[in-house]
């Protein structure tokens, strides 16, 4: 597989518990490079746009509230087969079902506060990266 980029968010539960360094260590140990990273406070508008695909789902309001409840760390990750690799490293959405050694198994508190977001496809990664970064922000 080719070298590619994916998008990651370390969610408010990770920043609140001061575990972003530990999560980054897992990401880097998996062979992914963090080539762009910023700590931001996501606005309601940013969260609603980012999670627009879930707008009709019953958890949408709670998700937006959670994602705006504290700082997040937005990241661009790069590596071979980065999208699939990061999804594997994150683990299942429900931490109780996540494999040992994954970020969610190690750090997530619940399905709702599951520490990280990662793009589900290369196309979505490009769209998600563009919402928070421009090429000048990425040091490959």
From Swiss-Prot:
Q: What are the UniProt keywords, alphabetically?
A: ATP-binding, Cytoplasm, Kinase, Magnesium, Metal-binding, Nucleotide metabolism, Nucleotide-binding, Phosphoprotein, Transferase
According to its UniProt entry, one GO biological process term is:
CTP biosynthetic process
- Show the InterPro entries listed in the entry: NDK-like_dom (IPR034907), NDK-like_dom_sf (IPR036850), Nucleoside_diP_kinase (IPR001564)
Q: Detail which positions bind ATP.
A: 11, 59, 87, 93, 104, 114
Give the cofactors, semicolon-separated. Answer: Mg(2+)
Q: Which SUPFAM superfamilies match?
A: Nucleoside diphosphate kinase, NDK
Cysteine pairings via disulfide bonds: none
| Enzyme Commission code | 2.7.4.6
Task: Specify the domain of life of the species encoding this protein.
Answer: Bacteria
What reaction does this catalyse? Answer: a 2'-deoxyribonucleoside 5'-diphosphate + ATP = a 2'-deoxyribonucleoside 5'-triphosphate + ADP; a ribonucleoside 5'-diphosphate + ATP = a ribonucleoside 5'-triphosphate + ADP
Cellular component terms (Gene Ontology): cytoplasm
**SMART domains noted in UniProt:** NDK (SM00562)
Signal peptide residues on this chain, from the entry's feature table: none
- In the UniProt entry, which residues are flagged as the active site? 117 (pros-phosphohistidine intermediate)
Q: Which compartment or compartments is the protein found in? A: Cytoplasm
GO MF annotation: an example: ATP binding
- Subcellular location, principal: cytoplasm
Record PROSITE patterns? NDPK_LIKE (PS51374)
Q: How does it assemble?
A: Homotetramer.
Q: What does this protein do?
A: Major role in the synthesis of nucleoside triphosphates other than ATP. The ATP gamma phosphate is transferred to the NDP beta phosphate via a ping-pong mechanism, using a phosphorylated active-site intermediate.
Q: Which PANTHER family match?
A: NUCLEOSIDE DIPHOSPHATE KINASE, NUCLEOSIDE DIPHOSPHATE KINASE DDB_G0292928-RELATED
| UniProt family annotation | Belongs to the NDK family.
Instruction: Identify this protein by name.
Output: Nucleoside diphosphate kinase
State the organism named in the record.
Answer: Methylorubrum extorquens (strain PA1) (Methylobacterium extorquens)
């Amino acid at each position: 597989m080719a070298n590619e980029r994916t998008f990651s968010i370390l969610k408010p539960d990770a920043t609140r518990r001061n575990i972003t360094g530990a999560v980054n260590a897992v990401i880097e140990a998996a062979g992914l490079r963090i080539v762009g990273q910023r700590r931001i406070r996501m606005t309601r508008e940013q969260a609603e746009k980012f999670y627009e695909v879930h707008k009709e789902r019953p958890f949408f309001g709670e998700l937006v509230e959670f994602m705006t409840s504290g700082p997040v760390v937005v990241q661009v990750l790069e590596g071979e087969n980065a999208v699939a690799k990061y999804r594997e490293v994150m683990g299942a959405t429900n931490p109780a079902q996540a494999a040992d050694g994954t970020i969610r198994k190690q750090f997530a508190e619940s399905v709702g506060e599951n520490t990280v977001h990662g793009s589900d496809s290369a196309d979505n990664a490009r769209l998600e990266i563009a919402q928070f970064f421009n090429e000048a922000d990425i040091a490959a």
